[in-house]
Structure formats: C-alpha cells, structure tokens
Amino acid sequence: NWRDIFQNWEALAHAYPSFIEGMIFRFLNASTFDGYNPYRVTKDGFDWEIIEAHDPWSYIGYWGDHQIIYLLKFLEFIQKHYPGKLKDSLTENHFVYAHVPYIIKSYQDIVKDPKDTIVFDEELHNQIDRQKEDLGADGALLKTPKGDVYHVNMLEKLLATVLAKMSNFVP
C-alpha cells in the first residue's frame, strides 16, 4: 500500500539519492486523470480494488490524501539534493495517467451521501484487463482516441491533484 511504499522509498532515497527522480515519476504516473491514486503500485504497474461478491469486506475507492504528503516529501527531498532537477519536467510531456475503472459521482450525489462517491465500471475494468493482456502494464494507462498512451507534463499532474481536492470538497 502507499504508506509502505513511502516508508520504504523514503529510506531508499536517503541511502541512494539518485533514485528519487524515478520514485517521483513512478508516484505521479500512478495517479489518474481525475487526480487520485489507485490502491497500490506494484512492479507490474498498479492495482485497484474491486467488489467481490463472496467477500463482505471488499470495497472500492481511491486513495489520495496521504499520497499528497508523501509526494511533497519527495519533491522537497529532490529540491534539497538536486536543486532545479525537475524544472524541465514541469513543461515536458514525460508523465502518464493511470486508467482506473472508477467513475466519480456527481456533486449532487456526493452531497447526498459523501461516503459513497464512486461507481465501479465493470465494463471498463474488463476492457483495461484485456488491454493489459495485450500491452502489459501500458494497457492500464489512459489512451488518446487513437489508442496511444496519453502523455502530460508534471505541472498538469500536480494541478490535477490540487483540483481534485478543491473541486470534490463537500462542506
């Protein structure tokens, strides 16, 4: 899970500071177009939770709040050890979006029940699984209408995260 990743990666970054840029890229590339993170990052990409009929404890949901703190710590670390290292990444399209089969409900629905905010899209889940069989981990990345992996810059990735928190705030 994300906490374990951060605790391990933070120690690794202190031992091997040159790894930090790759860690930041991996972290950001696991976020979705709507600014959230799936369940966990793995060596094969990332996973998301699904509802399992036989498991009453199964649950779906995005992760996001504590990942923002972890990302901030990584950004502070790279700035301390390699000042300006990520400057070009702000404008160069080196990043991708995770494609997770969750649909965020409308604001009106979220206000009605702020504890039930997403819908699992089983058809999209199956489509992504088929793409993963054909393309490997890239099958779970957001694509353009032509089927190419959609690339963005770091500024967009960071703004998506900020906007997700601001626009999905329920008073």
Q: Predicted regions span which residues?
A:
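Acidic, mature catalytic/reactive cores of soluble proteins
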Residues: 1-171
